[in-house]
Amino acid sequence: MSNLRIVCQHCPSVVFNNKRPDVVKRPTMSAMLHSETQEDLETDDFFLLKDPFAFDNVSVSKPLANNYKLLACADCEKGPLGYYDSKNNEYLLLCSLEKN
């Protein structure tokens, strides 16, 4: 399995440089933040991580009203790069951050 390297879009910090995680479909950040229910939500591709220590440089926000937390670059504090789902203990990093 190859490595995945994600660099912050706003500064030169490496956010993730580790084994390529599994890709899963989860609700988009917009849908997750604005929906009352979890039914029929628009989805997006995310890299799934269970261990916060797999990241090189990420910060996690305080819980939002729906108990999700946003992921951001720990150096420049810009994001969101994805979100943390505390109910399922999933750190979800946007696949769109990968540069081809």
Swiss-Prot record:
Signal peptide: none annotated. Residues 1-100 form the MSS4 domain. The keyword Zinc applies. One of its GO terms (biological process) is protein transport. GO terms for cellular component: cytosol; membrane. One of its GO terms (molecular function) is guanyl-nucleotide exchange factor activity. InterPro entries: Mss4, Mss4-like_sf, Mss4/transl-control_tumour. Disulfide bonds: none annotated. Zn(2+) binds at residues 8, 11, 73, 76. Gene3D superfamilies: Metal Binding Protein, Guanine Nucleotide Exchange Factor, Chain A. Keywords: Guanine-nucleotide releasing factor, Metal-binding, Protein transport, Transport, Zinc. Guanine-nucleotide-releasing protein that acts on members of the sec4/ypt1/rab subfamily. PANTHER family: GUANINE NUCLEOTIDE EXCHANGE FACTOR MSS4. Belongs to the DSS4/MSS4 family. This is Guanine nucleotide exchange factor MSS4 homolog. The gene is dss4.
